[in-house]
Regions:
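N-terminal helical cap/lid subdomain that shapes the substrate entry/recognition surface
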Residues: 10-21, 25-125
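Catalytic-core regions built around general acid/base machinery
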Residues: 126-137
Length: 182
């Protein structure tokens, strides 16, 4: 008997279903937000101390407006621009303590990876049940994310084997695809 809580999807109607990772399969938004907050608050506090200007922390509005769902370095640039701050670009190889777009982005990534490894990531059980139901109906399932850490998240949650295809920030960079719009 079909699950009444799941949409009636048949292989005759769909070849595959693509799920977004962040906010659909896993609650990584909380982990991302905490890592961004720690990164930017540390930077902004140091900047305030050095310039004598008041410290104004990174907010939930800042997270949603400037960094959520974007490639990491785009998020750094957009947030800093919102505060009138211009930093050197740096590079993807910039050390996480470097005062640059690359350095701040890499610092956020170090903090996020530490949190995922230490604390894990919450999974939305209803979505996982739906994925299993799709498999039972022989419908292919893929996962998409702008994150370069999709594999880390899937492995931390034990979900990696549920997906036949994965398109993420690593694939985006490899193929030169644009990220989500600013």
């Amino acid at each position: 008997m079909p699950d009444p809580n799941l949409p009636d999807i048949s292989p005759d109607s769909f070849d595959a279903v693509l799920f977004d990772l962040d906010g659909v399969i896993t609650d990584t938004a909380r982990v991302h937000a905490a890592a961004w907050t720690e990164t930017f608050d540390d930077y902004l506090r140091g900047r305030a101390d050095a310039t004598g200007q008041p410290f104004v922390g990174f907010t939930e509005h800042d997270y949603l407006a400037y960094v959520d769902g974007k490639p990491r370095y785009d998020g750094v640039r957009d947030f800093l621009a919102s505060r009138g701050i211009v930093l050197p670009e740096g590079s993807p190889d910039s050390p996480p303590d470097e005062e640059s777009v690359g350095g701040l982005g890499n610092r956020k990534n170090v903090l996020m990876r530490e949190r995922i490894t230490r604390d894990g990531v919450e999974v939305f059980d209803g979505t996982v049940a739906w994925i299993h139901a799709l498999h039972a109906r022989a419908i292919r399932v893929a996962v998409g994310s702008s994150s370069r850490d999709t594999t880390l998240v899937l492995e931390a949650t034990g979900l990696r084997d549920l997906f036949e295809a994965q398109v993420d920030g690593l694939v985006r960079a490899e193929l030169g695809l644009s990220g989500k719009p600013a």
